[in-house]
From Swiss-Prot:
It comes from Aspergillus niger (strain ATCC MYA-4892 / CBS 513.88 / FGSC A1513). Heme binds at C439. The chain crosses the membrane at residues 15-33. Cytochrome P450 monooxygenase; part of the g ene cluster that produces the acyltetronic acid derivatives carlosic acid, agglomerin F and carlosic acid methyl ether. This is Cytochrome P450 monooxygenase caaC.
Length: 497
């Protein structure tokens, strides 16, 4: 080896170390985000955040970071997490900030679920697209959809009675709630269910959704580092990619079938078709298909997650369960008297249970990420430069003493005027997000939550299988949404005097 080659070989590590040292110095001393509190390692590298992302512990880590550093924390070199109750939601979600390109690569290309630039004409298209879909989720539309929702809730109750009458074995309520909510949303969208409750099995495309969730963590990391994106094809299962293509084709076929089928009953598609091209606003067929795919997930999995969490919390808090049983049994002398209107207006404790379950175990635990537009913005009192990724972590915000007293205690009474919780910052509680991109399906979600929990409590005595599911909540992991283990519950028909 000649002298020149030896010098070049020895210099290479030094160059690498020099570049690394320069980057560290820049990130800590010169970077526009250097004034944001947070761990120094997180300011320099994505690795600490990625480690928790892969482990499914991002929300627990967010709670810890906000406890240590405050309401605004730099969690990655170009990402900031906020939990400020009064300012974070309106500052980030109350205006049409740009949806981050990081998640834009994961989402479908839809006029409603994706906007490239929050301050140009495409933002207007986004708002217009929501107007078309909003008719399907109105209070009036929900009343017309009640018979369909009731039918599947009744099927849930009937099938549980059939299965549990034969033996005293526990059943996995995570699975049963998913079957119910996916059947409801499929019938509302396509005019026919997945058939999960009928067959007591998970439809192949429902299973595909849960398989896909496991890939989101790695896709997120790869999207953060453009020079690593070529690894995506090596990491993501090619069979899974093919199944996703098959699912998209299946959704399009189902939409076509529903469009070509006349039906007197109101459902999502009837409202979309009736209001499309209203006042010159029209979704293309591709956008209808894309939003049907989105609504299949958003209108089912998150509701089932809340129901699973609420059931676990009720069964591990006997006093709360007894109070809820007393309310349901006294308000509804018969099973048939449980209607959407009745559970909304006559069951304050049930509604408090749902609100507290949404706070304690939010179905979407992480924040919807946004990118600060050109020129930068002031957010929660901090100047944030353009291009920075922002989000409000729901789980961290709801489990912070800065926003809620006794944040790690499950107390439905906090929503019923208990004076101990009068100083809770309700503005920090936004389980369906906030502003022009807030969840359109909140009315349907609340309706399903109330109706299913009320009829489950009215119909059954439930008991958690302590051996299998005692630590269920602790074993849940976050893959953007919750990955939930089996929730084994013994369900026995209630004896009505």
């Amino acid at each position: 080896m000649d002298v020149a080659m030896r010098v070049e070989w020895l210099a290479t590590p030094r160059v690498i170390l020099g570049i690394g040292a320069g980057w560290v110095a820049y990130a800590l001393c010169l970077d526009p985000l250097r004034h944001i509190p947070g761990p120094r390692l997180n300011a320099v590298s994505m690795i600490p955040y990625a480690r928790h992302l892969l482990a499914g512990t991002t929300v627990q880590n967010s709670v810890s970071l906000h406890q240590q550093y405050g309401e605004v924390v730099r969690i990655a070199p170009n990402e900031v997490s906020l939990i400020c109750g009064e300012t974070a939601f309106p500052d980030i979600y109350g205006r049409l900030f740009i949806t981050s390109q990081t998640m834009g690569q994961i989402r479908a290309n839809s006029a409603v679920c994706r906007v490239s630039d929050g301050k140009d004409e495409r933002a207007s298209k986004y708002v217009q697209g929501r107007r078309v879909l909003a008719h399907a989720f109105s209070d009036k539309a929900l009343m017309g959809q009640e018979p369909l929702v009731q039918r599947y809730v009744d099927q849930l109750i009937d099938r549980l009675k059939e299965v549990t009458s034969a033996n005293d074995e526990p059943v996995d309520m995570v699975k049963w709630y998913n079957w119910t909510t996916f059947d409801v949303i499929a019938d509302l969208l396509f005019g026919e269910p997945f058939g999960c409750l009928q067959d007591l099995s998970t439809h192949q495309y429902v299973a595909l959704l849960f398989q896909s969730l496991k890939s989101l963590r790695m896709i997120y990391i790869l999207a953060y580092y453009p020079w690593l994106r070529f690894l995506g094809n090596l990491i993501v299962d090619k069979g899974l990619i093919q199944k996703r293509k098959e699912y998209a084709t299946w959704v399009s076929t189902q939409v076509t079938k529903r469009i070509n089928t006349a039906t007197p009953r109101p459902d999502f598609m009837s409202h979309i078709l009736a209001n499309n091209n209203n006042r010159g606003v029209k979704l293309t067929r591709a956008e209808i298909d894309s939003n049907a795919t989105l609504m299949t997930t958003a209108g089912s999995e998150t509701t089932a997650t809340l129901l699973s969490g609420a059931t676990y919390l009720l069964l591990t808090h006997p006093r709360v369960l007894r109070t809820l049983q007393d309310e349901i049994h006294s308000e509804f002398p018969t099973y048939e008297s449980i209607t959407l209107e009745a559970v909304a207006k006559r069951t304050p404790y049930l509604n408090a249970v749902i609100s507290e379950a949404l706070r304690f175990f939010p179905p979407i635990p992480v924040g919807f990420i946004r990118r600060v537009p050109k020129g930068g913005e002031t957010v929660s009192g901090y100047w944030i430069p353009e291009g920075t990724i922002l989000s409000v972590s729901h789980y961290a915000a709801y489990h912070s003493e800065r926003n809620f007293r006794d944040p790690d205690s499950w107390v439905p009474e906090r929503w019923l005027g208990d004076e101990r919780y009068v100083n809770d910052k309700r503005a920090a509680f936004q389980p369906f997000s906030f502003g022009p991109r807030s969840c359109l399906g909140r009315n349907l979600a609340y309706a399903e939550m109330r109706l299913i929990l009320a009829k489950m409590v009215w119909s059954f005595e439930m008991e958690l299988d302590e051996g299998l599911s005692r630590d269920w909540l602790q074993r849940c992991r976050v893959m953007r949404l919750w990955q939930k283990p089996e929730l084994e519950v013994r369900v026995r028909p209630r004896v009505v005097a």
